[in-house]
Amino acid sequence: MANTTGEPEEVSGALSPPSASAYVKLVLLGLIMCVSLAGNAILSLLVLKERALHKAPYYFLLDLCLADGIRSAVCFPFVLASVRHGSSWTFSALSCKIVAFMAVLFCFHAAFMLFCISVTRYMAIAHHRFYAKRMTLWTCAAVICMAWTLSVAMAFPPVFDVGTYKFIREEDQCIFEHRYFKANDTLGFMLMLAVLMAATHAVYGKLLLFEYRHRKMKPVQMVPAISQNWTFHGPGATGQAAANWIAGFGRGPMPPTLLGIRQNGHAASRRLLGMDEVKGEKQLGRMFYAITLLFLLLWSPYIVACYWRVFVKACAVPHRYLATAVWMSFAQAAVNPIVCFLLNKDLKKCLRTHAPCWGTGGAPAPREPYCVM
């Protein structure tokens, strides 16, 4: 099933011509590399250059793009070389461990980062004032550093043969050697990845329930005015009684202060949240959930194959299924820029600004009424 010699396979003699399946693998992985490097580079430059994108969600997106770009530039060329040499590793055992460490590092980093993003998306919708006050540049840097630290903690132990990194011939890459769970320690790593994915979708599910319960604004409740002598004061008063008294048409004492007109300090200091701002946060939430869902869909076949190896000892994973699952996990590094440019209007507008041949964006939409969140 996997290479169990303990050392990467070396190629001796002349290279044999690649088969048809090898050509397909080379073409697909080359296309994935080009799309990933170009798309992530363009997206990263836009976020760095445009001041309008210097916000917490785009800082997290920048981190994801840089990680995917580095993964494509560092890990994928070794896979191309192994496919070109007949599914064999032509480099040293140490380089195999380094490449495997980086591949696992970027996988767990994406999972941890997507979970943190889901939490911030929930905070942005459900507790917007707290989110706007606390989610500063330094907070974003702390979240990103935490995600990288946890990823290193997950990817580093196999370097010391705790769940061994080896070249897997069927996958054409250096990665975890998944064997029967009684003979290996990789089950814990796979469970951690599955728990992260489940927790991320649970947070988005909670966000969806929150939006469903708050899909309509509460109706205005009219409070009746209070009167004992036809002065009509209180929360429901309009001030007409006081105006009549000043004009000389009233009798008796001056009407009391209109308590309902005056706002307390806490209500007056509440920040008004524009409807366009609410729509922007929801748009970002949809974009990041699409990224999360694609991460799950593209990695799920490979995760199923890993669990198959861990729990099923008698039957090996079909070769075509495993090859398809591995290349789907590679494709995940290229889909984020495509999703972002399709679902994010701000990114498309910035891209049109820096690409005059695509035309300029239309006139900005008129500002909509405000609502208090």
Curated annotation (Swiss-Prot):
Disulfide bonds join C96-C174. GO terms for cellular component: plasma membrane. Expressed in the ovary, specifically in granulosa cells of follicles that have passed the primary stage and in oocytes (at protein level). Expressed at high levels in brain. Lower levels in small intestine. In brain regions, detected in all regions tested. Highest levels in the cerebellum and cerebral cortex. Residues 1-26, 81-97, 161-188, 309-322 are extracellular. CDD domains: 7tmA_SREB3_GPR173. InterPro entries: GPCR_Orphan/Phoenixin (IPR051509), GPCR_Rhodpsn (IPR000276), GPCR_Rhodpsn_7TM (IPR017452). Keywords: Cell membrane, Disulfide bond, G-protein coupled receptor, Glycoprotein, Membrane, Receptor, Transducer, Transmembrane, Transmembrane helix. The chain crosses the membrane at residues 27-47, 60-80, 98-118, 140-160, 189-209, 288-308, 323-343. Belongs to the G-protein coupled receptor 1 family. This is Probable G-protein coupled receptor 173.
